[in-house]
Amino acid sequence: MGIKYSSKINKIRTFALSLIFVGFIVMYIGIFFRTSPFVMTLFMILGLLFIIASTVVYFWIGTLSTRAVKVVCPSCGKITKMLGKVDLCMFCNEPLTLDPELEGKEFDEKYNRKKRKS
């Protein structure tokens, strides 16, 4: 079975959402240390930092999303946003590319990495 790919924007949004849940879990763990105010406060502040990090990631992906190229997916016909040379449709996971040299090739996220000249 092949690698499960997802669009880059959706991956970053999922990461930001997971930061929120981690923050809540860390804060919840802090409640178990009610007898030690210092440890409880430490866990609460750490959880808050996870939630603030999530806010920063959401803000960053929002600004990145406004600069993304909008294309119409040939498979489902919906407008999707692309980051980089190759990406997947956000709705149907159809491989998309803006580079004519990559058309017809097997989808690989490595095409987005810049090659170093040696």
From Swiss-Prot:
Membrane topology: Multi-pass membrane protein
Homology family: Belongs to the UPF0295 family.
Species: Geobacillus sp. (strain WCH70)
Subcellular location: Cell membrane
Transmembrane intervals: 12-32, 42-62
Disulfide bond annotation, renumbered to this chain: none
GO CC term (a single one): plasma membrane
Entry keyword annotation includes ATP-binding: no
Keywords from the named record: Cell membrane, Membrane, Transmembrane, Transmembrane helix
Name used for this protein in its record: UPF0295 protein GWCH70_0499
Chain segments annotated as coiled-coil in the UniProt record: none
Signal sequence coordinates: none
